[in-house]
């Protein structure tokens, strides 16, 4: 379909491939680096390959954000079918310099580009992109698409149960959470994303994996309005069994409007490490 407004995001969005295709969303890949080997997220390495390597590779991986030129190429691709405007929604500017690259590219591009800071990542970003896409499907213009994304952003609830603090402390952009969690290394950390600032903060940790997964579930449903239709994603870093068990429980206890489980992009897995499980979503 020829849309008047093109949609662009980055590869931390974790949006299922079928939705990317259905809504014609252009994705700008980030890069994960092991030593001197660089891999484009979603193209050169799969999440499963990444998490297996993460456990054994002596090099702690790093990530590289897209350049402004990468975004210009994405804008060109996204507008090939005739779109006159572009809406770009990306990972929190407090977690990555991707937002700055997208803005610089917008200034370089010949057509109008609006860039939104999602104040989030993974499906905390992805649900915003999907909301904008569905508004476009319903006939909404750029302003309506932006408003839909912003409403979802403000309602987003996103908790992550970590199996270890090791990867988080090695190099994530998480502000004061590292200092707090470093003092309690022997526990299983629980963290969450603050949608108003786009930063990560610590919640109450647990002394066991079972305990932190229980806290993950309880904290998420404490902060979301379960009386309204809910859109939920269960995310995991190669911990599908635990994630699927949570999905089954959510379906039984709450019957959300939408729910699915997916593995997390390597770009975020660099910081959260193997075994992490998250619940992310919003209520209408």
What are these regions (language model features)?
Residues 38-88, 93-108:
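Class I S-adenosyl-L-methionine
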Residues 8-9, 88-92, 116-117:
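Short beta-strand segments
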Residues 3, 12-20, 26, 31, ...:
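Mixed-charge interfacial surface used for oligomerization/domain docking
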Residues 34, 92-93, 120:
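Conserved beta-strand edge residues that scaffold enzyme active sites
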Residues 5-65:
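N-terminal glycine-rich anion-binding loop in soluble enzyme alpha/beta folds
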Residues 65, 117-119:
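Short beta->alpha junction loops
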């Amino acid at each position: 379909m020829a849309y008047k407004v093109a949609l662009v995001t980055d590869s931390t969005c974790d949006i299922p491939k079928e939705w990317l295709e259905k809504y014609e969303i252009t994705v700008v890949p980030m890069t994960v680096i092991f030593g001197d080997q660089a891999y484009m997220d979603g193209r050169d390495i799969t999440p499963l390959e990444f998490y297996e390597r993460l456990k054994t590779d002596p090099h702690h991986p790093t990530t590289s954000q897209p350049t402004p030129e990468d975004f210009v190429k994405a804008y060109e691709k996204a507008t090939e079918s005739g779109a006159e405007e572009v809406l770009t929604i990306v990972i929190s500017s407090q977690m990555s310099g991707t937002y700055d690259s997208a803005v610089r590219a917008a200034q370089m591009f010949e057509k109008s580009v609006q860039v939104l800071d999602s104040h989030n990542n993974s499906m905390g970003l992805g649900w915003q992109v999907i909301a904008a896409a569905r508004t476009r499907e319903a006939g909404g213009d750029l302003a309506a698409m932006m408003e839909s994304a912003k409403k979802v952003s403000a309602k987003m609830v996103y908790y992550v149960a970590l199996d270890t603090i090791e990867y988080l402390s090695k190099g994530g952009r998480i502000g004061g959470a590292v200092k707090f969690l470093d003092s309690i290394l022997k526990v299983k950390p629980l963290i969450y994303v603050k949608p108003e600032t786009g930063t990560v903060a610590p919640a109450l940790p647990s002394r066991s994996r079972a305990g932190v997964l229980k806290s993950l579930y309880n904290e998420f449903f404490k902060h979301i309005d379960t009386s309204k239709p809910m859109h939920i994603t269960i995310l995991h870093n190669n911990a599908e069994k635990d994630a699927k068990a949570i999905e089954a429980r959510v379906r039984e206890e709450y019957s959300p409007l939408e729910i699915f489980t997916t593995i997390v992009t390597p770009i975020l897995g660099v910081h959260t490490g193997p075994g992490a499980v998250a619940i992310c979503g919003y209520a209408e």
